[in-house]
Amino acid sequence: MPLAVKSESGLMCCHSLPNEVMMPEFNEHILDKVLDPQDYRSDGSAYFMVWGRQHTQEQLDKLAKSWGVKLFCLGHAWVPGGIRAEFKNMLQLNSDHAKGVVLPVNLEKIQDATYTASMAIKLGSIRIDVT
């Protein structure tokens, strides 16, 4: 299973990103290499990509530049309203609870987190007819 998927236009979807304090130990090339057992350990870069919750704008900007990302779309954190745009280039969403959302994204033109979050659709508002 991949750690992340990235569109040519700059949307990266991943479970999480490393905590900011772990950046000195984080291998930014983790997405370009074959993972080895050390990457999965609690001090490994693959692990950091799954369990991080504390981010800063400076950190996000650095990773965005390194990876060619315009917008990070993350899960992992509990978001009571279903979606949150805490940083200009990172949003968090949940689809696994009563206020969960889905997010249509125009991959031809990636917008900032606030605009993109405004396009979220509450799962509870979607009607599915089963015949």
Model-based region annotation:
Residues M1-W67:
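Active-site-proximal loop/helix segment associated with metal-binding centers of metalloenzymes
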Residues P2-K6, G82-R84, G100-L107:
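Short beta-strand scaffold segments in enzyme catalytic cores
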Residues M12, C73, L91-L93:
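Hydrophobic/aromatic beta-strand patches that form the interior of the parallel beta-sheet core
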Residues N19-V21, F72-R84, K99-V101:
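Active-site environment of divalent metal-dependent phosphoester hydrolases
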Residues M23-E25, I83-M90:
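Histidine/acidic-residue-rich catalytic or RNA/ligand-binding cores of hydrolases
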Residues E58-L60, V79, M90:
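Eukaryotic intrinsically disordered and solvent-exposed regulatory patches
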Residues A64-V69, P80, S95:
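Non-catalytic terminal accessory segments
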Residues K88-T131:
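Binuclear metal-dependent phosphoesterase catalytic core
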